Amino acid sequence: MKPLREPAFARLWIAAFFSETAEWMLQIALPVFVFQTTGSAATTALSIVLGLVPAVLLSPVAGVIADRWNRRLVLCVVCAGQAFVALPLLFVASGGPVFVIYGVMAAQAGLASLFEPARNALVPELVAPGELIGANGLMSINGSVARLAGGWAGGLLLGFGGLGWVVVAYLGVLVIGSALLARPFRRVAAPKAARPHEPVLRAWIDGLREIGREGRLRLAGVVVVLTSLAQGMFLVLFVVFVLDILDGTEGDVGLLRGVQALGGLAAGFAVATIARKVAPAALLGWGGLALGLLSALIWNLPALTASLGVFIGLFGVVGAPGVLAGSGLLSLVQTAASPERSGRVLSTVFAGTAGFTALGALVTGGLLDVLGTGVLLNVQAGLHTVSALVVLGVSASGKLRRDPIPAVPRSG
């Protein structure tokens, strides 16, 4: 918990909680609303894809912005912008056409593609070099709480009050997050180096070269491809799994998605304290393996029981390895990328995540009626397992350099 002693990091940590809570509210509510309105898994998949594509298209700009501009200001403006572009959802809530949701999701995703690289590139600047993994663990904690609060609130508000209630709550949460970021962070070191006259495309390509040169970043790229395909499949299949296989409600969708935060909380505390000195590759590999095996158990268990209580417990547990793997991946990228290119490297990672998540969702939406839910769910679990085995194999071979976490300049 030591990074929270830094006031700037503590404020970023709280602001990130409100931002992620708002994001989870829409991530739960909008796909469920589309599925209930259209009754089509393919249409639901399309809505998910349209919410991911902008992150891929804006990757070159997002990374350069994160490296060149004041990262705190970028985060503040993005929060305010997300609140503004969500306003058309009030029109949908009052009977407007569903296709408006697609535009809103695309705009939200475009803004989020600016938020993630800036936030994650800012974290190493606000904590001591040796506390980076602990800081990422703390970010995982508030991410888990945000998932629980936002997922539960999104499903509950949609079920009891409709989409309008979700939107009003979403706007309120984002306003709080933006306000927390409005005041500058206290600079505790020199600002990051910048090259303001370098063309955007050339700067982005420079970040791509960084990934090609560094073995740890290449390994992270393999993980991103496999796990993002799995995540895209999950986004489509989860709604079908809960509503059709478990015969649940929209509230159950939010509950089961949000309850993963319980395991995530425990894992986040572990990463922030006792596991903060564990190698990122070990967290990524063993966490991913546990995630794949637990996912396979969950997807196949309805053959024996469809008890909601059982699945609440299992989804709570599966959140833990997800946080371990996520913290390991983020720390691996942060420590492998040079400080002056970290924003571009992170934006490329997030763009790859969005792109392959979209591909996974599209393929799943098209194959669902052909292969069936059960087969695709097991493929999804298998992708996580294969990804973890690749990481553990490369790590055991000794091919990963174990460089110390670099000291980086800090800026607000």
Each model region followed by its residue ranges:
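Alpha-helical transmembrane-bundle signature of multi-pass membrane transport and export proteins
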Residues: 1-412
